[in-house]
Regions:
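Short beta-strand "acidic-cap" motif of Rossmann-like dinucleotide-binding folds
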Residues: 1-4, 206
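Conserved N-terminal glycine-rich FAD pyrophosphate-binding loop of Rossmann-like flavoproteins
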Residues: 6-38, 42, 221-227
Length: 502
């Protein structure tokens, strides 16, 4: 059974991924890829997870995406067109123009639709995971090891809440960018999976490491991600006066790791009291830009900007969570029968900062391994007896949408200003007070209100925001995408290789 809160199954972060997916071109090696991942991760990567991804990930891309699903990656001559992205030693990124995620996801969904035994539940929001200790009507189940036995689901169209039992449950709920004021993520990236897993008792890992994409187009409609590949192909970043400043922050300038570029842009904006910086690729031939980046060219024109004509305004935006629900090599969490894959999980691959275009690769490999492990488990094990869960007891107080909207504004502004690119003890202390009070208010609101997707999202959002805040507050070491003003430098700290657990 595939469950998604979206009305269209394709609505996800994967669908909007632009740059590409890491594979293995001629002359590259697993060792070199692993080295690049570890360098970007700033010493916090799990070496075994990195080696697994570097060794098996590119082979799976070739086997599943290229040969079996025939994703139409761009070609050049007799081979593929490989692109270079920031912090990569070689050009090793496969892409489909500048809209790589969409054709990959379409191919995977089409393959799922061909399987007759897959049931689809769209417009269905998970309320909570079901556990033996909390949801079983048998009081002796509380003495069993923590075990997930399914989920409670809300049918958005009818408002009905029902329990669905499962021998294996896999979280693939994506990211949490919507808890920030500026984000490249779609509306559904509210941290739902993080919050549900935490309420069920799963261990969380490294949630302070939030990667901010350096370049999101500034527009009242929202923030449009401007792919890393633009800078890989020669785009430059300037301030309002037209000055390139990234060389002062890192020798690789525009091709430096994302956290370095994002902080440098943010700092420049603060120093100059400017609302945005500028990205410029207009020195390239216009036809080449339109051919290489057709999707971005089209989307930018819809927003009133022309990539081929001159610089366009950009800001850093919350983009990817390097942490999440702690998982092993097969996606198993610390709760029995619960697995996780993709951005909701923390496999240890990304460490303190993710290398560009490795997210699709990690999601592909860990999704493959988690699915295979779950299938083996289902074939070899059964629940020891039928499980009966407690019935849902609904409340019926109408939900005021103005309260939900205002609470989201408080969450997003607080996270952006105090738990964002630049963090300090004073900022984090203030954020803790604001978010803590708001959590209590939202929890009371949730317990009284009529169940809805919007109310669930708000509850999950505040709980995820507080989990990020706690991890950031506990970790005084500036490392990768977690930057503490006046914090300890990672290189001089004994915590350099220590993960932050919740």
């Amino acid at each position: 059974m595939l469950v998604t809160r979206a009305r269209e199954a394709a609505e996800s972060n994967t669908f909007y991924a632009q740059g590409g997916i890491v594979a293995r071109p001629p002359g590259d090696s697993a060792e070199l890829l692993a080295s690049d991942i570890r360098r970007a991760g700033d010493g916090l990567c799990d070496p075994e997870a990195v080696d697994l991804l570097a060794r098996e990930g590119p082979d799976l891309v070739n086997q599943l995406l290229v040969e079996e699903l025939q994703v139409p990656f761009d070609r050049e001559g007799d081979g593929f067109h490989w692109t270079l992205e920031g912090a990569h030693s070689v050009a090793r990124v496969l892409h489909v123009k500048d809209e790589t995620g969409a054709p990959i996801e379409r191919a995977l969904l089409d393959a799922c639709r061909r399987e007759k035994n897959v049931r689809w539940l769209t417009a269905t929001t998970a309320v909570d995971l079901l556990t033996l200790s909390h949801d079983s009507v048998d009081p002796t189940d509380r003495y069993d090891p923590p075990t997930v036995v399914g989920a409670r689901l809300l049918e958005r169209e009818t408002g009905d809440v029902k329990a669905v039992l499962a021998r294996e449950t896999i979280l693939a709920t994506g990211g949490l960018g919507q808890v920030y004021l500026h984000t490249t993520n779609p509306q559904g990236a509210r941290g739902d999976g993080i919050a549900m897993a935490r309420r069920a008792g799963a261990r969380l890992l490294n949630l302070e490491y939030i990667q901010f994409h350096p370049t999101a187009l500034v527009h009242p409609k929202g923030r449009l991600l401007l792919t890393e590949a633009l800078r890989g192909e020669g785009a430059v970043i300037t301030d309002a006066a037209g000055n390139r400043f990234l060389r002062d922050a890192h020798p690789d300038a525009e091709l430096a790791p994302r956290d370095v570029v994002a902080r440098a842009i943010h700092q420049r904006m603060l120093e100059r009291d400017e609302s945005y910086a500028f990205l410029d690729i207009s020195h390239k031939p216009a036809e080449w830009i339109r051919e290489r980046f057709p999707g971005l060219t089209r989307r930018c024109l819809e927003y009133g900007f022309d990539l081929t004509a001159g610089p366009i305004p950009v800001v850093p935006a919350a983009h990817y969570s390097c942490g999440g629900v702690s998982v092993d090599r097969d996606g198993a969490t610390t709760l029995a029968r619960l697995r996780a894959a993709g951005e909701v999980s923390a496999s240890g691959v990304h460490g303190a900062n993710r290398l560009a275009s490795t997210s699709l690769l990690e999601g592909l490999l860990w999704g493959w391994r988690a699915g295979a492990a779950a299938a083996r488990s289902v074939r070899s094990e059964t629940l020891r007896r039928p499980i009966a869960v407690r019935p849902w007891e609904p409340e019926f107080e109408p939900v005021d949408p103005a309260l939900i909207a205002q609470d989201w504004l408080v969450v997003r502004h607080t996270m952006w200003n105090y738990v964002g690119l630049l963090r300090s003890e004073k900022r984090l202390d203030r954020a803790g007070r604001i978010l803590g009070e708001l959590r209590d208010e939202i929890e009371n609101f949730y317990r009284r209100g009529t169940m809805s997707d919007e109310l669930l999202g708000l509850r999950n959002g505040i709980q995820t925001a507080l989990a990020i805040h706690r991890a950031a507050s506990d970790n005084r070491v500036s490392q990768g995408s977690h930057y503490r003003e006046n914090g300890t430098e990672a290189a001089s700290s004994p915590r350099r290789k220590r993960a932050t657990l919740l």
